[in-house]
Amino acid sequence: MYPAHLLLLLAVCVSLLGASAIPPLPLNLIQFTYLIECANKGRRTSFNYADYGCYCGIGGSGTPVDKLDRCCKTHDECYAQAEKKGCYPKLTMYNYYCGGGGPYCNSKTECQRFVCDCDVRAADCFARYPYNNKNYNINTSNRCK
């Protein structure tokens, strides 16, 4: 075996071992990221919404801090409805387009359409309401009751 092939094989093995310790990102969240950036025309990335208010990000409780946080609560509720329909919203891949008027769905199955609609409505909602930097990375144990 050539030394270059051995190096390549070693690099692949090391990267696979390292990747096994990293939790997988739910597949559809990658698509949701693109929908958010499409809807707000690149003004904010999805990372701005990953730890905003009481509902944007992992989990959620209490009263939303503003209209933008309410968008996240509504998105969580939409995903809960998708699960009741037997869908797996965080794993469901769907077809969508980013046009001049923002994102829209073009999926075939009921679950794909439902989950995509949840994500498009949330992305449009994020674009509609102002972002308050004071509501990013808040102390949820104090403010989300």
Curated annotation (Swiss-Prot):
Q: Where in the cell is it found?
A: Secreted
Q: What is its EC number?
A: 3.1.1.4
**UniProt cross-references to PROSITE patterns, sorted A to Z:** PA2_ASP, PA2_HIS
List, alphabetically, the Pfam families matched.
Answer: Phospholip_A2_1
**Recorded superkingdom:** Eukaryota
Where along the sequence do coiled-coil regions lie? none
Propeptide stretch(es), residue numbers: 22-27
InterPro entries documented for this protein = PLipase_A2, PLipase_A2_Asp_AS, PLipase_A2_dom, PLipase_A2_dom_sf, PLipase_A2_His_AS
GO annotation, biological process: arachidonate secretion; lipid catabolic process; phospholipid metabolic process
Q: Which cysteines are joined by disulfide bonds?
A: 38-98, 54-144, 56-72, 71-125, 78-118, 87-111, 105-116
Q: Where are the transmembrane segments?
A: none
What reaction(s) does this enzyme catalyze? a 1,2-diacyl-sn-glycero-3-phosphocholine + H2O = a 1-acyl-sn-glycero-3-phosphocholine + a fatty acid + H(+)
Cofactor binding annotation = Binds 1 Ca(2+) ion.
**Keyword Metal-binding tagged:** yes
Q: Which GO terms describe its cellular component?
A: extracellular region
Catalytic residues at: 75, 119
- Which keywords has UniProt assigned to this entry? Calcium, Disulfide bond, Hydrolase, Lipid degradation, Lipid metabolism, Metal-binding, Secreted, Signal
User: Listed GO molecular functions?
Assistant: calcium ion binding; calcium-dependent phospholipase A2 activity; phospholipid binding
Q: Which cofactor does it need?
A: Ca(2+)
Q: What is the annotated role of this protein in its UniProt record?
A: PLA2 catalyzes the calcium-dependent hydrolysis of the 2-acyl groups in 3-sn-phosphoglycerides.
Protein family according to the UniProt entry? Belongs to the phospholipase A2 family. Group I subfamily. D49 sub-subfamily.
PANTHER family linked to this entry:
PHOSPHOLIPASE A2 (PTHR11716:SF51), PHOSPHOLIPASE A2 FAMILY MEMBER (PTHR11716)
Write down what this protein is called.
Basic phospholipase A2 PC16
